[in-house]
């Protein structure tokens, strides 16, 4: 998933990764590889794997995986008066302002391999 400019989303299962049940909020959980640096101030870096609780709603301030048109991105979600703001957590990047988007889920964890 893009942590930068959104990119075309294609559902593709690369692998399965066992996770202890105490770390899983429910069965509707998936993982995504992060590409880009828009979420570095939130501790999400290029190459990380994020854990996402699948749901189609989000509260202001939650980090979400979202579809904008056919492009997927990870950003902080804000529902404002007449639009949605998908805010990067990188001071050098601008927010994405859209009339609507599809929430894929809320990020609740990060795996980092080094």
Annotate the PLM regions.
Residues 102-114:
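Glycine/charge-rich catalytic "coupling/switch" loops of P-loop NTPases
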Residues 1-41, 72, 79, 83, ...:
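Short, positionally conserved secondary-structure boundary motifs
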Residues 66, 86-88:
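SH3/SH3-like beta-barrel fold
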Residues 90-94:
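Flexible, small-/acidic-enriched active-site or ligand-binding loops
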Residues 47-48, 62:
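Structural motif
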């Amino acid at each position: 998933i893009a942590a930068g400019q959104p990119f075309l989303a294609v559902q593709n299962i690369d692998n399965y990764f066992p996770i202890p049940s105490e770390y899983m909020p429910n069965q509707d959980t998936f993982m995504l590889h992060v590409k880009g640096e828009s979420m570095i101030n939130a501790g999400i870096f290029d190459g990380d794997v994020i854990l996402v609780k699948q749901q189609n709603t989000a509260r202001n301030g939650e980090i979400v995986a979202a579809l904008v048109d056919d492009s997927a991105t990870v950003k902080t979600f804000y529902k404002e008066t007449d639009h949605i703001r998908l805010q990067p957590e990188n001071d050098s990047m601008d927010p994405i302002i859209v009339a609507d988007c599809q929430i894929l889920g809320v990020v609740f964890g990060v795996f980092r391999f080094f």
